[in-house]
Design a protein with these regions (language model features):
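Phospho-regulatory, Ser/Thr- and acidic-rich intrinsically disordered linkers and terminal tails
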Residues: 1-133
Length: 133
């Protein structure tokens, strides 16, 4: 982890979002700020559905650089701001390389990702942030 934080500092990044796992499955997002060291700034429990789980077969090329993340907020409460902060996104952003769609669901907030350069439909994965209203 120390090497990851050093690399982030060297490249001028202000945050590192870590997907923590349990028994090989995503279990939480952990946010580190490189200048604060190995102290977790925020942790959010999650569940995830992969592209395969969602039945998506369209090939999606990864973005190889930091892109702008726009947020489409359908939740409208403090949970939206917390999730946007994890990803370094502003709730006011309306255009970006990736659009993060936040919707309320039974367990908390469903996070879907849309890549306007590929499709107007979600491209996966689908993440549920387990957060109470």
């Amino acid at each position: 982890m120390r090497e990851l934080l050093d690399e982030a500092l060297m490249h001028g990044h202000t945050r590192v979002l870590v997907v923590q796992t349990r028994v090989g499955n995503p279990s939480s997002f952990g946010l580190l700020m490189p200048e604060k060291g190995l102290e977790w700034v925020d942790e959010v429990p999650i569940t995830a559905r992969t592209r395969r789980d969602l039945g998506l077969s369209q090939r999606v090329m990864p973005l190889f650089e930091d892109g702008i993340v726009a947020v489409e907020d359908r939740v409208g409460d403090r949970r939206s701001g917390r999730i946007a902060a994890l990803f370094g996104a502003a709730l006011e952003a309306s255009e970006g390389d990736t659009v993060m769609v936040l919707e309320p669901c039974e367990k908390g907030v469903k996070i879907s990702f849309v890549r306007p350069d590929i499709s107007e439909e979600p491209v996966g994965p689908q993440i549920t942030a387990v957060l109470a209203p």
